[in-house]
């Protein structure tokens, strides 16, 4: 069989991108990163306007002189080439009317982003100049290689942690908090939704701290500014999920004050049903003295008030948490305080570990280490109380009709999860076979299920 590529006599020419870089060394580094990504994807870099298929102009907007230089450079690129993408500091600058300055002065530009926006620039380049085919790289789907089922995926938004909890050594292994650029996060999320993902699980070591390390720097997504901050990210992910009829679930959410801003998104408006009413909050304990020894925030009363307020705003809210029983120095009274907290907070999903020393953790040096049997007894007692609370809450769902995402199909019908159930760690819904013999459930589809029974952490229902 003949190779069809031979008929052209030569390989297809790679698309060419011109680059104009203005401003400070930080802007120069951004330009280097853009060029590096372009080359990695198979684009060629043109040294002239007329030799380029489009031009990227990296601007400066620090002083008036730099603003004018940047506007002139954009105008020149438009005149000489006609296809221009603008990035850099001037991209974030507003005009006197409040609109984007660049779009007002040069309305023919293809796209505008702010500084440090490699992902956004590449998205714009792809839209106007599709990347060349690479027989090796193109074997990798845009969403990347995933080890989860096709219909759900984890989205890591940061690495590392700034906390110094005495029982934990994660910071020594993973380092300080490093937040991913918001455009990069959004692009990955979009690719995942496009690939068929119906549930996106947002993860990190500390989701609430997203953006702290970059002082909540403003990035760009789809031509609009977007803060590197949890509230804004969740809102943008929710909007994206709504476009694809999908869910966004939040994990590892420390109870910082701005978490309060997320709850209304779950309860009302266009994001309801997409930003799930579900929070995974690692409380770890409830007694202030124990929390102090753990080097954790130590205002349990305030936490309880906030949990109650969250539920007033969003009655369907599911709260998952993890705790440690038998921490060094924990007294009987302090343990009872923990049990009281579980009852009052009515946490839906709870995990508990008997304290165990971790090599390298500062808690190893604390006085008051408890015997193994005491630690295990407290863990078991804790889980008894937690399961009583959980069973009471889950029983309230009987008789309701809930939206269920199907994870598995078998002869007995289907197995899925509600908004209250994260994969692997929470309960499931056993769905009876469809009434019509011709109807079979599909993995990754949503179905409305009337709940007919509850047992432990799981539900039973029928369509």
UniProtKB/Swiss-Prot annotation:
- Please state what class of enzyme this protein is: transferase
GO BP: tRNA modification
Cofactor(s) this protein requires: [4Fe-4S] cluster
- Protein function: Catalyzes the methylthiolation of an aspartic acid residue of ribosomal protein uS12.
A GO cellular component entry from the record: cytosol
Q: Which reaction does it catalyse?
A: L-aspartate(89)-[ribosomal protein uS12]-hydrogen + (sulfur carrier)-SH + AH2 + 2 S-adenosyl-L-methionine = 3-methylsulfanyl-L-aspartate(89)-[ribosomal protein uS12]-hydrogen + (sulfur carrier)-H + 5'-deoxyadenosine + L-methionine + A + S-adenosyl-L-homocysteine + 2 H(+)
User: Where in the numbering of this chain does the Radical SAM core domain appear?
Assistant: 147-392
Fetch the Pfam families from UniProt: Radical_SAM, TRAM_2, UPF0004
Q: For this UniProt entry, what is the primary localization, expressed as one broad class?
A: cytoplasm
UniProt GO molecular function:
4 iron, 4 sulfur cluster binding; aspartic acid methylthiotransferase activity; metal ion binding; protein methylthiotransferase activity
Co-factor: note:
Binds 2 [4Fe-4S] clusters. One cluster is coordinated with 3 cysteines and an exchangeable S-adenosyl-L-methionine.
The organism encoding this protein is: Burkholderia pseudomallei (strain 1106a)
Which residues does the annotation say bind [4Fe-4S] cluster 1? 24, 60, 89
Q: What is its EC number?
A: 2.8.4.4
Which superkingdom heads the taxonomic lineage of this protein's source?
Bacteria
Span of domain TRAM: 395-463
Record-stated family: Belongs to the methylthiotransferase family. RimO subfamily.
Q: Where is the MTTase N-terminal domain?
A: 15-130
Range of residues in the leader sequence: none
Q: Where does [4Fe-4S] cluster 2 bind?
A: 161, 165, 168
Assigned keywords, A-Z:
4Fe-4S, Cytoplasm, Iron, Iron-sulfur, Metal-binding, S-adenosyl-L-methionine, Transferase
* The protein's name in its UniProt record: Ribosomal protein uS12 methylthiotransferase RimO
Lineage per the UniProt record:
Bacteria, Pseudomonadati, Pseudomonadota, Betaproteobacteria, Burkholderiales
Q: Does the keyword Protein biosynthesis apply?
A: no
